[in-house]
């Protein structure tokens, strides 16, 4: 495969869409934002060059006023609530998750939902019109009991990762391609490996 070429699976999928007369909607999601950084500046520049919409998942407990000021007026950028503090509350030996109850520590679903509601209100206050009703669970995971009741927090949609959608009352709009190689240096993946 030539350098810079997309994977055969991705190209085949795009061909199927074209044959069916479908048009892919492309948008980006970036997680873990709390303040303006050089990396975020590069991402903002890229979204402007390519006119690509961006859903920026902001951690409410650590979000800064400086971030809100930097993003103000950028109409292709919308803000999602990204948990509360991005702290792992999963039981020992389980995959990381903030949006989970943990009976061993006394953390209930009500506790989790309270944090999410507080974070959602804080994001709305800080980012005003750019704020969305989206909730992006840290590590793209949440307990089923939390997902079932998420609408009680003011959140109106969920964005996770992958093609699967959990059975919940709220709609999901997931990302489907991860551009970052998290296990090998946390850098961008080569185009030919995206599928």
Predicted regions and their residues:
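C-terminal active-site subregion of NodB/CE4 polysaccharide deacetylases
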Residues: 2-39, 153-195
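Active-site beta->alpha N-cap acidic-glycine motif
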Residues: 2-78, 132
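Metal-dependent polysaccharide deacetylase catalytic core of the NodB/CE4 family, i.e.
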Residues: 53, 57-145, 177
